[in-house]
Amino acid sequence: MATREHDSGLCVAVENMFPWTAGRGTVQAYLPHWDPVPQPYDHVTMDLSHTATARSDAMAMVHALGDRLAHVHLADGSGSTTLKDEHLPPGRGNQPCAEFLEHIAESGYTGAVALEVGTRRQDRTGREAVLAESLAFARDHLAAGLARREP
């Protein structure tokens, strides 16, 4: 990855994923692994729906990544199954979305936060409401983190 980044001048941010299960076993769907934290990637994308599906500790992950965090996919998940990546609106699952957003803002994160919520089952009005709710959630918690930031 480092060579590709250097040669292209692009930032390649590898995303955290989750283990795939088949029957009682797991399938190695991602190489070298679904968890980018111990890998030597310079830049990582963190998806909170994926931390739910993987049953990973999102706050431990963001602390471990530190300055390697380059991009965020903001969503939530229940973590009730490792078979379904839910992409719930933030605040509707079991992930610490509020704490996560406040932490990255307070820490000086300068990358993008992209909403990645599932709206396929919604009509236009429902979709707009879910997106507005998610955007307000993100803005509120990023602002709270910024307010605590040391000048």
What do the predicted segments below correspond to?
Residues 8-10, 111:
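Residue-level signal for beta-strand positions within conserved beta-sheet cores that form or flank
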Residues 24-151:
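Histidine-acidic metal/acid-base catalytic patches
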Residues 2, 6, 105:
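Anion (oxyanion) recognition and catalysis
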Residues 10-23, 46:
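Aromatic-lined carbohydrate-recognition surfaces of secreted/lumenal glycan-active proteins
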Residues 1-2, 11:
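Hydrophobic, well-ordered secondary-structure segments
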